[in-house]
Amino acid sequence: MNFNQLIDHTYLKPEATKKNIDNLIMQGFEHNFFSVCVNSIWVKYVKEKIKKLNSNLKITAVVGFPLGASITQAKAHEAKLAVEHGADEIDMVIAVGFLKQKDYEYVLNDIKSVKKAIGNKVLKIIIETALLTKEEIKKATEIVLKSGAEFIKTSTGFSYRGASLDDVVTMKSVIKDQKLEIKAAGGISTLEDMQKMHEAGATRFGLSKSVEILKNQKVETKY
C-alpha cells in the first residue's frame, strides 16, 4: 500500500527555522505527502512557498499546542487566523485536565468553538493518550464524536509517549462505523507500526521521519 497520501509530514519543534521548514516543504512536495504540519507562526510562510511550487500540498496547523491549556477564545482565534493565513486543516489539543476531572461539557464546548471558528476546514482533535487511562480515551472519543470534528488524534509528540496500536484499537472500538477518522501521531518508528495501525483503523499519520519510515528504515524516537 502507498501511505504517502495518508501522511501529515511534521515539524513542530520550537527551535524551527526557515531552513527546517523549507526542508519540510520540499520533502512534502517531492514525496507527495498529504500535508505539512507546522506551528501557526509558519502558516503564511508555508503557503507562499507552496504557491511558488504550484503544488497541491496541504497545510495543517496546530492550535493550543502542545498543552491544550489555553483558554477557548485563544484557541478559536489562533485557529481562525491560521485558516486566514492558508491552513487547510487544524490539529487542536483538548483541555486534558478538564477531561480528567470529568468536566466533559467544557471539553466539548472547547472543541465546538474551534470548529465554529474554522467553518468547513478539517478539524483534528488531539487527546494526548499518554496522559489518559483507557476509559478516558473512550470518553474522549465519545466527546469528539459529538463535536463536529472530522478526526481524533492520539498525541502531540511532546508527552512521554506517542501513538500506540492499543490507542487506535480503543478509539475504533467506540467509533465503530460512525463518521470520525483516526490520526495516529508521535513515536511511530517503522512502516510495520503504520501498517498495523492502519489495519486497526487509522487513516492519517503524523510523522516527522516520514521519508525514512517509507524507505522501511527504523528510526529513533525520543521515547
Curated annotation (Swiss-Prot):
Active site residues per record: 91 (proton donor/acceptor), 153 (schiff-base intermediate with acetaldehyde), 183 (proton donor/acceptor)
UniProt main location, coarse: cytoplasm
Top-level lineage group: Bacteria
Broad EC category: lyase
Pfam family, one: DeoC
Protein's pathway: Carbohydrate degradation; 2-deoxy-D-ribose 1-phosphate degradation; D-glyceraldehyde 3-phosphate and acetaldehyde from 2-deoxy-alpha-D-ribose 1-phosphate: step 2/2
Localization per record: Cytoplasm
Keywords, sorted A to Z: Cytoplasm, Lyase, Schiff base
GO CC, one annotated term: cytoplasm
Listed EC numbers: 4.1.2.4
GO biological process, one term: deoxyribonucleotide catabolic process
GO terms assigned for molecular function: deoxyribose-phosphate aldolase activity
Catalytic activity: 2-deoxy-D-ribose 5-phosphate = D-glyceraldehyde 3-phosphate + acetaldehyde
Function: Catalyzes a reversible aldol reaction between acetaldehyde and D-glyceraldehyde 3-phosphate to generate 2-deoxy-D-ribose 5-phosphate.
Family to which the UniProt record says this protein belongs: Belongs to the DeoC/FbaB aldolase family. DeoC type 1 subfamily.
Name assigned to this protein: Deoxyribose-phosphate aldolase
Organism whose genome encodes this protein: Mycoplasmopsis synoviae (strain 53)
